[in-house]
Amino acid sequence: GPSMVRSAAKNHASVAIVTDPADYGELISAMDAKRGATGYDFRRRLAAKAYAATATYDAMISQWFAFADQQQAFPDTLALAGRKREELRYGENPHQSAALYIPSGPHARGIAQATQLQGKELSYNNYNDADAALELVSEFRDGPPTVVIVKHANPCGVATADTLLEAYQAALACDSVSAFGGIIAVNRPLDAETAEAMAGIFTEVVAAPDASDEAKAVFARKKNLRLLLTGELPDPAREGLSLKTIAGGYLVQSRDNGRVTQEMLKTVTRRAPTAQE
């Protein structure tokens, strides 16, 4: 169990502890080169991976006891565990480095779990904008066809209609200038007709639950456009924590899953708007 793994890692000066099958090939090569032995630097690297594996295991157990068992909103100790999925070209600015980590465990679902079918690698800003677009369009998960267009993490067009094409045309009409180079998210499987319309202007990313083969063929002509398939959209009412780093600490709050209803809207001007307004 974990105790044996930690014990072996602690003694990495003379023990090689392998917890990742991806290291089997390098281990065999190292042993072949050294007549059954391994180098210290290699063992130290294996030990680091072993400690990371046991730390992740312990963090997942800690999270279960803190949230699932005791129903604590904010536990005394917040144990975080994530696995690096990829290193990104740069961060929010070109001089910053960046990487994408995904939470350990089987239940995470969102833009980080989307499948990219085409296009160059996503940047830090692409992920940030696509996340904002997916979170917003998920508000309409069970609604009529809806299209969201986001630029710099802010919506510049949102519309619902009888068809996905009509919703896209209406969303684009909100601010066609800002939509150039933006991120699009939809709440329905993407069809070829809508894909053709989207391909008419430069778009960084399109995120959809699914896409028809014909829609994929349309986007295949746009080599720089990234098509992300998300599967079923996340539940906008799901609970969870939102975390933000500040200098010297973390700010943690519950997810913003509140919904605005018609009853909550009030007229605060002297004159009420007309139905057309």
Predicted regions and their residues:
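ATP-dependent carboxylate/acyl-activation modules
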Residues: 57-59, 63-277
